[in-house]
Amino acid sequence: MEQTYVMVKPDGVQRGLVGEIISRIEKRGLKIVALRMNVISEATAKEHYSEHAAKPFFPGLVGFITSGPSVSMVVEGKDAIRVMRAINGATNPVDAAPGTVRGDFALDVGRNVVHASDSPEAAAREIAIHFKDSEIGNYSRIDEVCLYE
């Protein structure tokens, strides 16, 4: 099964959307194998978003991500990366379809509630930034036999 990294950003936590987002993840047949709420350090935020370091919005992004608690998760399932990106919707909420997390809840491209890895390489890198291997669980959902061929 594929794993991906998902973060409910500080705006999602502050607006009480954590339970709604987790519910949507689980209803799609994905499972959460690691979960933590914490305030991400500046160093971790810079490492996580290092591909944006030269962009003008980088300082604001780091400031926002470190401004309050966020919820980090490792999500696992068949095509987990693609499925999570579909659950989240387009990065810019103006382009996000209704029924997606961002389409339903995001207010602005800079306050778009949630992050998910966009590739297997990004998922592996982001999971390693936020979790030790020993923090990632391994279990089977009782309905897995019905969910996957």
Swiss-Prot record:
Pfam families: NDK (PF00334). Signal peptide: none annotated. GO terms for cellular component: cytoplasm. It catalyses: a 2'-deoxyribonucleoside 5'-diphosphate + ATP = a 2'-deoxyribonucleoside 5'-triphosphate + ADP; a ribonucleoside 5'-diphosphate + ATP = a ribonucleoside 5'-triphosphate + ADP. One of its GO terms (molecular function) is nucleoside diphosphate kinase activity. This is Nucleoside diphosphate kinase. Its cofactor is Mg(2+). The active site is at H115 (pros-phosphohistidine intermediate). ATP binds at K9, F57, R85, T91, R102, N112. PROSITE patterns: NDPK, NDPK_LIKE. It is found in: Cytoplasm. It comes from Methanosarcina barkeri (strain Fusaro / DSM 804). Belongs to the NDK family. The gene is ndk. The keyword Kinase applies. InterPro entries: NDK-like_dom (IPR034907), NDK-like_dom_sf (IPR036850), Nucleoside_diP_kinase (IPR001564), Nucleoside_diP_kinase_AS (IPR023005). Its EC number is 2.7.4.6. Major role in the synthesis of nucleoside triphosphates other than ATP. The ATP gamma phosphate is transferred to the NDP beta phosphate via a ping-pong mechanism, using a phosphorylated active-site intermediate. One of its GO terms (biological process) is UTP biosynthetic process. Its main location: cytoplasm. Keywords: ATP-binding, Cytoplasm, Kinase, Magnesium, Metal-binding, Nucleotide metabolism, Nucleotide-binding, Phosphoprotein, Transferase.
